Amino acid sequence: MIVAKTDKSLAQEVLKFVAPRANIQGVHSDFTHIGYYDGDKIVGGTIFSHYDGFNIWMHLALDNPRAMRRSYAKQVFEYCFYTCKCVRVTAMTKPNNIRCRKLIESAGFKQEGIVRKVIREGMKFHNAVLYGLLRNE
């Protein structure tokens, strides 16, 4: 059974899992997290970063998208909108990551545009699809 964990002692483990899968760069200290574990094995995670009082960036990575149960999605949005009092949540993914795009859109995010050459993989830069979810949506 997969359980969500927010223990501070797991923060770096969750970041190490999510960062390469979600193309996160530059998030090393000021972030919060939710880790999804099957026993002792991490199978997913959400990193929240760049909180400015109104907006927070959400970075999600899962070994299996079916692992994201509705109760976990609810926990993610409660954290963003009720704990942090955000007006919006922002997410990005590569245009060819269809599974991620479907998951983001099924959660209610709206596509807002394309950000050019923002995702770096090695020495290559890729475009990203920018998504936003407003509290009142």
Residue ranges and their predicted role:
Residues 1-24:
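Short amphipathic alpha-helix that is part of the acyltransferase structural core
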Residues 30-44:
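Conserved beta-hairpin
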Residues 40-45, 56, 126:
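Glycine-rich phosphate/pyrophosphate-binding loop shared by adenosine-nucleotide-utilizing enzymes
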Residues 53-64, 92:
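Conserved acetyl-CoA binding element of GNAT-fold acetyltransferases
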Residues 68-79, 98-106:
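Conserved acetyl-CoA-binding loop-helix of GNAT-fold acetyltransferases
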Residues 82-93:
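Conserved GNAT acetyl-CoA-binding A-motif
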Residues 91-101, 118:
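Conserved beta-strand-loop-alpha-helix junction that forms the acyl-donor binding cleft
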Residues 110-125:
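Conserved catalytic-core motifs of GNAT/GCN5-like acyltransferases
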